[in-house]
Design a protein with these regions (language model features):
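GNAT-family acyltransferases
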Residues: 1-90, 95-98, 114-115, 119, ...
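Conserved acetyl-CoA-binding loop-helix of GNAT-fold acetyltransferases
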Residues: 93-95, 101-116, 138-142
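Conserved hydrophobic beta-strand within the GNAT/NAT acetyltransferase core sheet
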Residues: 125-129
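Conserved SAM/SAH-binding loop-helix junction
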Residues: 135
Length: 172
């Protein structure tokens, strides 16, 4: 596999917000232009605050995607939180604009799914995309997700979104 998923601890998240070059040095990897934009800095800040309050959620938070050759932080994503009472966990992912179109999102999202199903509490994985065919919908389709509906919630999203689901594989 070309992409490694690195779970972010509080120090990773602080460096992503305040000093991306220090984060790159810590991981021995380059940070491509456009990866850590202002919209993500706010997410990293809130993820760090939540992690400091609840350290037990470490593996269910933000992750960085590391391309092994050349060694570069190619994206970010992770989970929206630990599995809920119904055994559902939600994933999200983003790849640096300069590295899109190479299958990296499929690899990273696939690894997030594999890691989620390694926890016996997880019954299915959820994802959301814009309500139109796009690169993200193709990633989910390649991984076996199925579209289960459309969500319209102007308070959360200005545009409609599609909901996707991937059930835990049945044992052979």
């Amino acid at each position: 596999m070309r992409v490694q998923v690195i779970t972010c601890d509080a120090d990773h998240l602080a460096a992503a917000v305040d000093d991306p070059p220090a984060l790159a040095a810590r991981l021995g990897a380059a940070v491509p232009e456009g990866l850590i934009e202002d919209e993500f800095r706010a997410s990293f800040r809130s993820a760090r605050e939540e992690l400091l309050r609840r350290p037990e959620i470490l593996c269910w938070g933000t992750a960085l995607f590391l391309l092994e050759e050349p060694r570069v932080i190619c994206g970010m994503g992770g989970y929206k939180g630990p599995p809920d009472d119904g055994g559902v966990v939600e994933i999200g992912y983003s790849i640096a604009p300069s590295l899109r179109g190479r299958g990296l999102a499929t690899e990273a999202a696939g690894e997030l799914v594999r890691m989620a199903f390694a926890d016996p509490r997880v019954r299915w994985v959820r994802a959301h995309t814009l309500a139109q065919p796009n690169a993200s919908t193709r990633v989910l389709e390649k991984l076996g997700f199925r579209k289960i509906g459309e969500l319209i919630d102007p308070a959360e999203h200005p545009d409609p979104i599609w909901r996707w689901r991937l059930d835990r594989p049945r044992p052979p």
